[in-house]
Amino acid sequence: MKDLGGLMKQAQAMQQKLADAQARLAETTVDGTSGGGMVTVTLMGNGELVRVLMDESLVQPGEGEVIADLIIAAHADAKKKLDAKQAQMMQDAAGPMAGLMGGLPGMKF
């Protein structure tokens, strides 16, 4: 039974680490770029788009479709980076128990 108590303590500690990691992630921002840096978007840790920066040379008549495509590409770049950062933070928080958590609902590793 000692082992069970130790396992429960480990699980509670990991749960706290995961909650802390999720809180840090909520405050995290990532940038995604496209068009060789002509468009940059910033996402919060929850995926919310909070900023779009564009090179002024893009703001010309007839460039609307190009701008839209570049924004979408920059968003996809930022989302990919955010997903990688989320996975790494959760992996780090779970520590040696990460392998056990992969099969649990709601746990992304």
From Swiss-Prot:
Keyword DNA-binding applies: yes
Keywords: Cytoplasm, DNA-binding
GO molecular function: DNA binding
Entry's Gene Ontology cellular component terms: bacterial nucleoid; cytosol
Main location: cytoplasm
InterPro entries tied to this protein: YbaB-like_sf, YbaB/EbfC
Annotated localization: Cytoplasm, Nucleoid
Family listed: Belongs to the YbaB/EbfC family.
Function: Binds to DNA and alters its conformation. May be involved in regulation of gene expression, nucleoid organization and DNA protection.
Subunit structure: Homodimer.
Protein name: Nucleoid-associated protein CCNA_00269
